[in-house]
Amino acid sequence: MLNMRDVDISGKRVLIRVDVNVPLDANLNITDDTRIRAVLPSINYALDEGAKVIIASHMGRPKGQVVPELSMAPVAKRFKRLLKKEVELAPDSVGPEVKAMVEKMKDGDVIMLENLRFHQAEIDNDDAFAKELASLCDVYINNAFAVAHRKNASVVAITRHAPVCAAGFLLQSELNYFAKAMNDPARPLVAIIGGAKVSSKLGALHHMLQHVDKFVVGGAMASTFLKSVDYNVGKSKVEDDLLWEARSLMKRATMQGTAFYIPVDAVVADRFSPDAESKIVPIREIPPEWMIMDIGPATALLYSEVLASAKTIIWNGPMGVFEMDAFSRGTMSMVNYVANSYALSIIGGGDTDVAIHKAGETHRITYISTGGGAFLALMEGKTLPAVAALERHQAKI
């Protein structure tokens, strides 16, 4: 797979696919521009090389309809501020008006295409739409790790038509960090897996079990593991159809010598509410009508001891309902332990990055992935469609 440094982009029309699907408030102001800042190195490199830069992205889920509230206008405005140069917003992502704008570009100019998902063809990986997108450029750069797991026209089909295709710095960096952590890790390698459902992490759990030395489990999904070994978890959310699978995973871990840690105590509540009555109880003493909302202090201490010896940490998913302050302590404790660790730490998806930002510890984490689903797909051992498309293109030429 080519990197953008490997191709000549001087004076060329360079379409850079990014994922700047950023959160907006009610007034359409950007509340977190992390994803925008993450793609700046690739854009600045292209500009320094004298390219004509065309930025393409999506925003939200407009389902193939033009939704004014999901326009790329706020993003174009933020790019203008960060790049310190004019960034013109195109009226669409394809069409004669866009084509005319591109033809008038001079070296060093920047255009931002309108929301790609205003066209259903983008979601459908439509070849004709991809061909029209590709006609705008001489070089296509995929720098959108967060959608690298999706078979969209601007991610996959476009590589069949663009003359030259390569990976941007962000995409390459994401892949390199994960590959190092999985294929050549400093050990012990500890995986922290949290979040709501075992079902959504099952593939990752199976694949990671082949690589990690220790597993740490939290979040609502821990309830399924706890019940699978006969703990009463009250009214906690449990995936009963996966109890055998959960028990089997733990047994497999034991047989191969991989430590598998589940909570020993929990913060439980009488209802799912920020102002619910709550208390800390040992796992064996969860009241029948109560539910687990967070890991308890004894569990946090146990997990801190596991992390203390770690040399590599991969974390996906919070330890509890951390968006409710009353049940955020477990996740925030883990953030603190990981941040204070000397291990190479990689954080990705499952709102874990939100917790890191909330705690103000981003600067103490080795790498925070911009991808959720894409990061999980790597944890499952899958080849990302975006990467496969770039590799096919290189093989063809």
From Swiss-Prot:
Broad EC category: transferase
Residues annotated for substrate binding in this entry: 19-21, 35, 58-61, 117, 150
A Pfam family recorded for this sequence: PGK
Catalytic activity: (2R)-3-phosphoglycerate + ATP = (2R)-3-phospho-glyceroyl phosphate + ADP
Superkingdom of source: Bacteria
UniProt keyword Methyltransferase present: no
Presence of keyword Cytoplasm: yes
EC number: 2.7.2.3
Subunit description: Monomer.
HAMAP family: Phosphoglyc_kinase
Family: Belongs to the phosphoglycerate kinase family.
Record-given protein name: Phosphoglycerate kinase
Organism of origin: Desulfatibacillum aliphaticivorans
